[in-house]
């Protein structure tokens, strides 16, 4: 009896523990913006839809167990087995219909998230570059000329276009109460529209494991009224220190960081999405070397001051759409250097040189 009692108590304890573990705030189902609301509605719809299917199956299963169970009054039951094309077609179409019923709203919600919310699509979105760097988030406001670390202020009732990229490892940008996650990857820029309808502070984080500092890569989204946001932006720009290339390169060194605020943005001298190898030069500048995290005896000594000059880049490209500021990495007449140019860039440079030489020859021949 004691063994049975112990087993029951252990089972009850594990059950209570499991129930308590689920008592946290389900932020995904507590949306504070139109993007998150659409995704929350999709989740609830999918759960209810699948519960109906599961309950239907269990009801049918129970009926079959009860109706066709072995009974004393029916000793020999011979099932009437024969083929039925109608039934076969019917139960083949059922899963097809289920997939369609789930796929249509899912696809609609996904595509709706690729554009500004319809309720505020007439408003000009605020554009914020969100750059992931182990293990911190760097937010750049090109219009307001502000840069923040591990927190971002946004106005309410206005679409926000986050341009996501990563300076190093792949991460995932996620603010559960404002919208679903999207990957931030090196060498590319991903667009993510979000919007907050209520004033407040919302928690954001990296949702993709990327090493020992993963748990610390969190940030706050501070939603303010339009008036308060403009006031904050004006005061922040006037009172914060100017971000320099030295400061930015130091931020790229792996490690956690407190909240920081700067005037200006790093987009003035580099866009890591267009120059994904920039981070490695930043490592060299401060003497950082990647080590084995599983070996406590391997450490990397980081210099307080840069040991190499800044990497020269030029950011002037009017051909790109608004805020897509790409560095002109290859300059006219500049040679190839493995620390600065990729193979495809070298090929492009050679093609340009050949084209220029051909045009010059054609011009000279025409003059003669």
Functional labels for PLM-detected ranges:
Residues 25-42, 68-368:
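Non-transmembrane, membrane-proximal soluble domains of secreted or membrane proteins
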Residues 19-22:
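C-terminal motif of bacterial Sec signal peptides marking the signal peptidase cleavage site
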Residues 56-71:
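Membrane-water interface of transmembrane alpha-helices
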Residues 8-17, 39-56:
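Alpha-helical transmembrane segments
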Residues 1-9:
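Bacterial N-terminal signal peptides that target proteins for export
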